[in-house]
């Protein structure tokens, strides 16, 4: 009798896998599956033990473990020998489960380096997860950009934002609204707020009197302040006054969960839906929600992002919360990391710093901060920014896409239908087939030494296609203004004893959005320079 029951359990496991679980997507249903396979069985076992039904309890445990082990065995056999991606190269453990990458992605946050290493071993097309192929081939960029988004973008399920949605119609409708916030006229209004942030930054750096300054947090404060104006139309007073802010604290805390997003996006869906695990995952969203409610209750004449989002007749409060999260995270965190990288690269390359300072001095006729109309015509400044974006793109692991019915051909390689494909930006940007001396900081590759850029189309820091970054104009304006302001007034110096190597002294962590650990620089006032 016992063997018969266990046999039925095994059969049920195999049938549920082959008929149900290999069809469709289950990531967004992670909480339901967790309760069905973990919470409920454990609760039942505890209940049976409480009433003294030990025999039934033992039998249930056997059946439960038999089902779990059988479905795991079925999954292993399918993924190794029957899966549509079985012929693609890659590590055997990666074909079986994403558990292979838990430490690399979620703990060490070095997923970008692991992917780069796999491509160096296995080639342009590598199976990095049971259902996902990583493609390091610039010829495939445009074709891949046409594909739909993958389940990675269900992480906010059941809610949506401009970025975290797979609903193309929702995205297109939301995109039109966001575009208004980054139109040329809107950018002129935003420029004044960024200028004010730069002035506060210059005042703060001057007050330090040449003492070491922790750069990573300072740049995060600057960009968070500018996002306060852009998104909510108000100041957070975090630069000159050095005030702390709950939203800023929550953002820094929640960023540590970015590794989970890269390892297995469904883990964040699970965290947000399990009462005993949700506190850290939701505290950041609670702050965003409070800001949204406050902004809705206090209409202003400011043409911030929310002035456009609130005009949307189909607006949903929860979706507004996730749009605000997107704006603050994408607008402040990613830009702050790029600014941090630029400053360190300039500090470790004094010759490049001197060239940039000369360009700034030559163009700085009307005082600081210079207007955008001047900054966009400064080739070396823009080259330094582009080179930092190449070496340290904001999203190093790239974007996930899903092949449609019939599959897709990428540079001659067929990818079966309904498979996931990602294009690792960090790896592409550091591929010697695309850029000569790819690991070196050479701003001239974008100007006088263009021969060092073999494939300009391989430069994709803001992504491409319909899902490209809408905030690029604002990010570029802010980076140009901050860097030019600093270069006009200060020399950047490393602390004594600091190695002259960016990668060795300030390694980049892949938290979905790049993170550069804390380090300090000396902002030494330039002799004879008067800041207007």
UniProtKB/Swiss-Prot annotation:
Q: Which InterPro entries match?
A: Cyt_P450, Cyt_P450_E_grp-IV, Cyt_P450_sf, Cytochrome_P450_monoxygenase
Q: What species is this protein from?
A: Hypoxylon pulicicidum
Functionally, this protein is described as follows: Cytochrome P450 monooxygenase; part of the gene cluster that mediates the biosynthesis of the indole diterpenes nodulisporic acids (NA). Nodulisporic acid A (NAA) and its chemically modified derivatives are of particular significance because of their highly potent insecticidal activity against blood-feeding arthropods and lack of observable adverse effects on mammals, in particular the tremogenicity associated with the paspaline-derived IDTs is not observed.
As for subcellular location, the record says: Membrane
Q: Name one GO cellular component term.
A: membrane
This protein's membrane topology, according to the annotation, is:
Multi-pass membrane protein
Name of protein: Cytochrome P450 monooxygenase nodW
Q: What is the lineage of its organism?
A: Eukaryota, Fungi, Dikarya, Ascomycota, Pezizomycotina
Binding residues for heme:
469
Q: Where are the transmembrane segments?
A: 2-21, 31-53, 60-82
Keywords, comma-separated and alphabetical? Heme, Iron, Membrane, Metal-binding, Monooxygenase, Oxidoreductase, Transmembrane, Transmembrane helix
GO MF, one term, reads:
monooxygenase activity
Q: One matching Pfam family, short form?
A: p450
Looking at the keywords, is Heme present?
yes
């Amino acid at each position: 009798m016992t063997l018969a029951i266990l046999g039925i359990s095994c059969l049920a496991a195999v049938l549920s896998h082959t008929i149900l679980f290999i069809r469709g997507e289950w990531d967004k249903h992670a909480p339901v599956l967790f309760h069905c396979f973990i919470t409920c069985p454990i609760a039942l076992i505890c209940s049976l033990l409480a009433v003294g039904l030990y025999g039934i309890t033992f039998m249930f445990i056997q059946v439960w473990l038999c089902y779990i082990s059988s479905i795991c065995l079925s999954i292993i056999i399918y993924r190794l020998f029957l899966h549509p991606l079985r012929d693609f190269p890659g590590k055997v453990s990666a074909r079986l489960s994403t558990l292979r990458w838990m430490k690399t992605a979620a703990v060490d946050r070095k997923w970008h380096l692991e992917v780069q290493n796999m491509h160096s071993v296995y080639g342009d097309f590598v199976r990095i997860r049971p259902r996902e192929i990583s493609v390091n081939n610039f010829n495939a960029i445009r074709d891949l950009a046409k594909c739909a988004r993958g389940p990675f973008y269900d992480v906010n399920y059941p809610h949506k934002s401009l970025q975290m949605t797979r609903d193309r119609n929702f995205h297109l409708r939301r995109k039109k609204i966001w575009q208004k916030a980054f139109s040329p006229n809107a950018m002129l209004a935003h420029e004044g707020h960024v200028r004010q942030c730069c002035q506060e930054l210059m005042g703060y750096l001057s007050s330090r009197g040449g003492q070491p300054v922790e750069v990573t947090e300072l740049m995060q404060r600057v960009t968070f302040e500018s996002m306060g104006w852009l998104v909510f139309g108000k100041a957070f007073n975090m630069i000159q006054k050095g005030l702390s802010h709950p939203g800023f604290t929550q953002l820094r805390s929640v960023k540590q969960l970015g590794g989970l997003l890269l390892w297995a996006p469904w883990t964040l869906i699970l965290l947000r839906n399990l009462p005993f695990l949700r506190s850290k995952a939701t505290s950041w969203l609670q702050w965003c929600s409070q800001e949204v409610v406050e902004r809705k209750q206090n209409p202003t004449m400011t043409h911030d992002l929310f002035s456009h989002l609130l005009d949307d007749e189909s607006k949903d409060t929860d979706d507004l919360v996730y749009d605000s999260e997107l704006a603050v995270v994408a607008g402040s965190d990613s830009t702050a990391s790029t600014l941090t990288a630029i400053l360190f690269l300039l500090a470790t390359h004094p010759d490049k710093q001197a060239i940039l300072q000369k360009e700034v001095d030559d163009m700085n006729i009307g005082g600081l901060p210079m207007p955008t109309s001047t900054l966009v015509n400064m080739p070396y400044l823009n080259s330094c920014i582009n080179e930092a974006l190449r070496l340290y793109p904001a999203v190093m692991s790239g974007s996930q896409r899903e092949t449609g019915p019939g599959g897709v051909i990428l540079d001659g390689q067929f990818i079966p239908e309904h498979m996931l494909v990602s294009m690792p930006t960090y790896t592409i940007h550091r591929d010697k087939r695309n850029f000569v001396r790819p690991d070196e900081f050479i701003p001239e590759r974008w100007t006088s030494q263009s021969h060092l850029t073999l494939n300009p189309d391989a430069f994709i820091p803001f992504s491409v296609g319909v899902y490209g970054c809408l905030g690029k104009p604002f990010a570029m304006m802010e980076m140009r203004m901050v860097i030019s302001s600093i270069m006009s007034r200060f020399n950047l110096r490393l602390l004594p004893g600091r190695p002259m190597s960016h990668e060795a002294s300030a390694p980049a962590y892949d938290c979905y959005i790049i993170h550069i650990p804390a380090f300090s620089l000396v902002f030494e006032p330039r002799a004879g320079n008067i800041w207007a």
